[in-house]
UniProtKB/Swiss-Prot annotation:
Record's protein name: Caerin-4.1
Keyword Secreted: yes
Organism: Ranoidea caerulea (Green tree frog)
One GO process term, biological-process aspect: defense response to bacterium
Signal peptide span: none
Organism domain of life: Eukaryota
Task performed by this protein: Antibacterial peptide, that adopts an alpha helical conformation which can disrupt bacterial membranes. Each caerin displays a different antimicrobial specificity.
């Protein structure tokens, strides 16, 4: 559903931020 899509997008965003901090 919509909530699953929101959670998925939030997870992708968080992963991107973490990768940005690491590098």
């Amino acid at each position: 559903g919509l909530w699953q899509k929101i959670k998925s997008a939030a997870g992708d965003l968080a992963s991107g931020i973490v990768e940005g901090i690491k590098s």
